[in-house]
Amino acid sequence: GLWEKIREKANELVSGIVEGVK
């Protein structure tokens, strides 16, 4: 559903931020 897609995108953003901090 819609929430799954939103959460998936949010996880990608968080992962990108974490990678940027490393």
Curated annotation (Swiss-Prot):
Protein name: Caerin-3.4
Family: Belongs to the frog skin active peptide (FSAP) family. Caerin subfamily.
Modification Lysine amide, positions: K22
rRNA-binding in keyword set: no
Tissue note: Expressed by the skin parotoid and/or rostral glands.
Superkingdom of source: Eukaryota
Cellular compartment(s): Secreted
Keyword Secreted tagged: yes
Job of this protein: Antibacterial peptide, that adopts an alpha helical conformation which can disrupt bacterial membranes. Each caerin displays a different antimicrobial specificity.
Record keywords, A-Z: Amidation, Amphibian defense peptide, Antibiotic, Antimicrobial, Secreted
Any one annotated GO CC term: extracellular region
A Gene Ontology BP annotation from the UniProt entry: defense response to bacterium
